[in-house]
Amino acid sequence: MRFNHFSIVDKNFDEQLAELDQLGFRWSVFWDEKKILKDFLIQSPSDMTALQATAELDVIEFLKSSIELDWEIFWNIALQLLDFVPNFDFEIGKAFEYAKNSNLPQIEAEMTTENIISAFYYLLCTRRKTGMILVEHWVSEGLLPLDNHYHFFNDKSLATFDSSLLEREVLWVESPVDSEQRGENDLIKIQIIRPKSTEKLPVVMTASPYHLGINDKANDLALHDMNVELEEKTSHEIHVEQKLPQKLSAKAKELPIVDKAPYRFTHGWTYSLNDYFLTRGFASIYVAGVGTRSSDGFQTSGDYQQIYSMTAVIDWLNGRARAYTSRKKTHEIKASWANGKVAMTGKSYLGTMAYGAATTGVEGLELILAEAGISSWYNYYRENGLVRSPGGFPGEDLDVLAALTYSRNLDGADFLKGNAEYEKRLAEMTAALDRKSGDYNQFWHDRNYLINTDKVKADVLIVHGLQDWNVTPEQAYNFWKALPEGHAKHAFLHRGAHIYMNSWQSIDFSETINAYFVAKLLDRDLNLNLPPVILQENSKDQVWTMMNDFGANTQIKLPLGKTAVSFAQFDNNYDDETFKKYSKDFNVFKKDLFENKANEAVIDLELPSMLTINGPVELELRLKLNDTKGFLSAQILDFGQKKRLEDKVRVKDFKVLDRGRNFMLDDLVELPLVESPYQLVTKGFTNLQNQSLLTVSDLKADEWFTIKFELQPTIYHLEKADKLRVILYSTDFEHTVRDNRKVTYEIDLSQSKLIIPIESVKN
């Protein structure tokens, strides 16, 4: 078990004393160490009679004895306060060593009054075995009163806002878009959950088109057939222009202003990180945007009309937009309780909306926490001129997602009024996204946030799984690289798939975000010493490390051929039985592919030395095929039996993370380290007619040509004895169209190479 603390802010001794005093620990430097220990335990909500101090004495007996307090005894007691079990989790008498091996913060100096006070200060900042830092656990147990005012410790807000007194309001914000050209600004329903307090509150906002309901049946009916032939394209250049939808002014009309919303709500999905912040004095707002239940408009899916319908909420919080108590617009309501500062949170589509909102430069958006977000929708549904479904969702496209999230149709009255217009616009979207060619076009350009990163004012916190094949790592990498030099940004890169990481045992993620949000949203100094990149190592249990950048400038080139004359070949076509089997379950295909049982070329590469991949691996291939259209798929495995982290979390302990005071309990989870025969490092796909994003070229049958394309970026450490397996093939039954033509691909390995960006030891 290893704990990684990134949230701890260094404080000088006077600051430590002042903060301890605020918690009720009022000590003098003239006290001896045992007196301070005794008072610490008395003031805490822990049961000191249950604690063991030495191999022979419990704490009560130790405090009465003449034995001096030393660091070994300190850690015997401290580990128990951190929920470790003596004689089972750790051995009494070896507690100091156990704490050090667990990477717990320690004072490495002689035992003095000042040092013991500092040790208790940092112990309160330390993560418990069950996932909360000690001070937060004790506050949830009643160390401080629920007075609905801010209390801070180590630059973090504590849970002193009463979750039983939360206000839950429903409002409609006037957006600056008219997505169906009705001649009226679209109204957007929002749900607010906020502590009852006289303080001016900041907002943690989650923009989720899923939030008010999804239409699974419409989604399933809209899915595209993947068993189609690849289209041949004529050579041409693609032209796009940078344009944004015009923001509409609201029609000025004097209305009565009220300070209370008549509509309330009780239930609904909430993000547990937002719940955590609710009890620490941050309001939560959930907004689903245009084309969703009880709002106006069409589900425009990813364009800036949708983004503006989200940022309208930030405008309202800052007095630049209007909100109403109902869709009838009879009464206006103002955000008199808000301080105007906003952070956006959420994973997947939710993180996507955060990326998009940041690129508008909207005033009041102080930072985004974008988890597994999409920075360019083309790269989610397409790749290098090829239709490419996101991992796990063959047949999905942006029109399918629109059908899923156009939740207005879930209400019968809205269905009657709006379905005909919706069907017309959905058909237009299906045509515009152009599944036949797979090429970039104006439709996708309008949904590319990367071209507007120069407008970003908010600090950017990125969370992404390097084993996420749904929203692939390039979405985070490209946004990271597109931000202007010197922009405030940090990335948490974990080894999971498409998952949240705010309830993991090994890292104090929520507390780190707490310190950042407090500084940016409550106008306090940002003293958090956070590295640019926080990386979970790929072959070690519960180990996180710091890096300077995502993407390295140094490269090595590994030839794919082992001799001067070296060729590989694979066929595209499968017999009917195999084709049907793979089409029915792409997981069967993936297993066969990784075990060299599919139509593929396999190249095993030895490494010249230990190395860490950092960035997108590039393939440079010399090949030919007996057709005038074709596509290539590539996957690279870390091949060979060894221990690796799984990409899905397992529960370590149920309902032990208290998000407030007996409020919204969460499971404690972690990625397990397990034996496996291989692990996917990266993958990529390309249409052989698309040598670049905006150029389509002719392909001549039976003629050799060279193509270069990047695979998904990653950071992955390999030892010299490890082996990389490169798999080259065409049809991928999870991602690509299932083109079963009889095409043979031949690769000249002697003129082909793998180009790997590698990390320097210094970084």
UniProtKB/Swiss-Prot annotation:
What GO cellular-component annotations does this UniProt entry give? cytoplasm
Q: Which residues form the active site?
A: S348 (charge relay system), D468 (charge relay system), H498 (charge relay system)
Top-rank taxon of the source lineage equals Bacteria
Q: What is its EC number?
A: 3.4.14.11
**Pfam families xrefs:** Peptidase_S15, PepX_C, PepX_N
Family label: Belongs to the peptidase S15 family.
Q: What does this protein do?
A: Removes N-terminal dipeptides sequentially from polypeptides having unsubstituted N-termini provided that the penultimate residue is proline.
Recorded protein name is: Xaa-Pro dipeptidyl-peptidase
Give the originating organism: Lactococcus lactis subsp. cremoris (Streptococcus cremoris)
